[in-house]
Amino acid sequence: YDFTHILIAGYGLNLLQVAPLLPYYDIDPNIVQFMGTGVIDDKTFFYEPSLQGAIFPGIPETKRINLINNYMEIYEEEFLRISTLPYDLMGLINFIYTKKYKFGDVIELLNNPNKKFDGIDGNFYFKNNMIERNLDILKISNGNSYVIN
C-alpha cells in the first residue's frame, strides 16, 4: 500500500455501505487503519465487522450515560446524540446567569481560551469565536468503543 490510514467520512447507511466494500477492494483493515469522524460514535456502527479496530475522536459513553438514561426514563424516547449540544449550552447559560455576568463579562469569558467548560461531550472552550473540544481517540471493538490515548 502507498498509505497507512484511510478516513471514512460517511455516516448512516452510507457508512454501512462503504466500509464493507473497502476489504472487498483489497484494503485490508488489518494493515490499513480505518479512521472515522465523531459521527460514528453510535452503537449501530460498533457491530459492523469491517469497522472493528477503526478509530475516531470522541469521549467515552460513560460520560453521558446518566443523561441518556434519565432522558429515556422521563420521555420514554431515545436520546438524540446531537442533544448534548443544547444541553451544554443551557449549562453555560445557567453559569452566566447565576454569576450575574454583564454583557462585557460574557464576551470576556467566551474569548478566554484558558477558560474550559465541562460539557457532556467533554471539555470545551471558545477560540476565535469557535468551539474547541478536548476529545479522546476511541477504538471500536466487539460492540463497544474504548479510549486508546
Where are these regions (language model features)?
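Extracytosolic ligand-binding ectodomains
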Residues: 1-149
